[in-house]
Amino acid sequence: MSEKIEGIIDDLLNLEENAHGIAIIGKDGKIITQTENWNISNDLDKLNEFLNEKLALGKKGITSLSIQGIKYMIVENTEERKIGTNITGKGHVVICPIPIGGTGALITYVNPRAGPRDVLFNVQEYAKKLTDLI
């Protein structure tokens, strides 16, 4: 992992106190990095399927996703962002495809006490910074 990517992750974690875990998937579908407290490797195939899914107009696509044994209901699925929330209060995930609509991603686990929209702007901005790096 490059120092630039590491710096971007550190900056996001310092800025966004409700981001409790971060992972980056490269455009090739492989994990580039993840924070020590969040391991997505066992869920990588499903995450890649989700990222590679191209929705036809009016179609729902994948409706739920499990990461580290926690099931998230997909509440928003657009080219810019994919948001999942655990209905039992175990947190949220914000997935920002890199580039927008692409197959890479910045994946963020969000504190259960916060809402996914609390971190959305910052996560999307930092995903844009990764576009030419992954």
Curated annotation (Swiss-Prot):
It is found in: Cytoplasm, Cytoskeleton. SUPFAM superfamilies: Profilin (actin-binding protein). GO terms for molecular function: actin binding. It comes from the Archaea. Inhibition of rabbit actin polymerization is reduced by phosphatidylinositol-(4,5)-P2(1,2-dipalmitoyl), a soluble form of the phospholipid phosphatidylinositol, suggesting an unknown lipid might regulate actin-profilin interaction in vivo. Residues 55-62 are annotated as: Loki loop. Pfam families: Profilin. GO terms for cellular component: cytoplasm; cytoskeleton. Disulfide bonds: none annotated. Coiled coil: none annotated. Keywords: Actin-binding, Cytoplasm, Cytoskeleton. Binds to actin and affects the structure of the cytoskeleton. At high concentrations inhibits spontaneous rabbit actin nucleation. This strongly suggests this archaea has a profilin-regulated actin system, and actin-type genes can be identified in this organism. It is not clear if Loki profilins 1, 2 and 3 are from the same strain. Belongs to the Asgard profilin family. The Loki loop (specific to some members) becomes ordered on binding to rabbit actin. This is Loki profilin-1. It comes from Lokiarchaeum sp. (strain GC14_75).
